[in-house]
Amino acid sequence: MLPTQLFAFGFGYVATELARILKADGVMAAGTVRSATSAEPLLAEGWNISLWPGHDIIPPDNAAWLISVPPDEAGCPVFRAFEAQASSASWLGYLSTTGVYGDLGGGWAFEETPLNPQSREAINRARAEEQWLSLGANVFRLPGIYGPGRSALDRVREPNARRIVKPGQVFSRAHVSDIAGALRLAMIQKSPEHIFNICDDEPAPADEVLVHAAQLLNLPPPPSVAIEDANL
């Protein structure tokens, strides 16, 4: 059974898509962003948006919570600020990253694969996961996210587009609408499982994806740059 309200801590790309899907089910949506600039287009679309941190907010009782605010070295800022209120939520969902698995050398990662975060961000994500799992939340580990305005098709149209090449490195991906659909289903089914990898099963090098996108648009592929020369 779907909730009557969604409250998204971090009303970003995925949360917006989920809110649009749930609107068709009669679910109201509200949430937070960090800046007035981010809030402006969301308010124009009709969503109830608050600025946080910086303003006091009270999530509505019995709402489904979706958390995607970036973690810090102490874990999730939302967890620290709202742990006491989390028991009033009808569902808790935390958006994490497949980066918590670390470098598997092209191997597959499954939900039961041991975590081996390498970057500071991934280490922080793993810590935040632990916090939300302690409250019974669903954790969704996401790969590269694409969709309208954020796809390889958009990138190859950019005047300064380039292909960063790192031999042997492959990524899985997920379309934003597929992620939102999975989140909606998780709200309905309330599975006893708590960790979900939402991604395709056709991992590919990032540069090959851009080449394919250019071919679809009858454009020349962007120039290639070795990763050690990319100044990332």
Which residues does each predicted region cover?
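Conserved N-terminal Rossmann-fold NAD(P)-binding element of oxidoreductases
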Residues: 5-11
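Mid/C-terminal beta-alpha module of Rossmann-like enzyme folds, strongest
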Residues: 182-185, 189-232
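N-terminal Rossmann-fold NAD(P) dinucleotide-binding loop
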Residues: 15-16
